[in-house]
């Protein structure tokens, strides 16, 4: 006997959360890291209407709509992933954030030329993201899991130091080895804000959260332990309390 859509959806939710808790489930639940975005014509239209990427992220109605678009088109997906950007954290820490067409994000001033203590935090910049989470949660099928996220400290630090993306992370490595105390302070500041940010997403309705660490694979074992495993473990412990 075929199950009803509600029964299938309820089972999907249970399997997502069970899988994230390390349980063996089948069939495996499915969601995609970039399931909301440019491959969808409805996203491209909304993106064009908003003008800038940051305006889209900070319009909670629009960001909620983008988060839900893949679920409308592909109802078999078992989770929604929040539509936002990993650079919201350095924006909240006090760097200016812009997105340059054809080039990508820019953070100013880059921390190779500016002091961390000169940045003025604007943690209120996180509030619209929480509002997006609340709006998605209100419109989402109750049996579909909502996943929030943030950038992991190393990857976020790479952008903060260089002011933009870097394939070889040369500026970050130069600072980390040349002034390890400052680099550790940057990692620590990111940790603090990320704990608050992920906790805020959970309070707003996210059922699971994750960290994206794009550049972790480029590190030697000792660097990985110091700049990836240790801060990630501290964030996970703090958010899980």
Question: What is the meaning of each model-derived region?
Answer:
Residues 125, 131-241:
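Active-site loop segments of alpha/beta catalytic cores
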Residues 45-48, 112-115, 175-178, 214-216:
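A short alpha-helix capping/helix-coil boundary motif
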Residues 81-101, 105-122, 206-225:
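Glycine-rich, proline-tolerant flexible connector loops at the mouths of alpha/beta enzymes
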Residues 2-97, 234:
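N-terminal basic, low-complexity leaders that serve as flexible interaction/assembly modules and, when applicable
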Residues 19-35, 77-102, 123-168:
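Glycine-rich, aromatic-flanked loop segments that form ligand/cofactor-binding clefts
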Residues 52-77, 120-137, 182-196:
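Glycine-rich anion/phosphate-binding loops
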Residues 15, 38-41, 104-108, 169-171, ...:
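Short hydrophobic/aromatic-rich motifs at helix boundaries and adjacent loops
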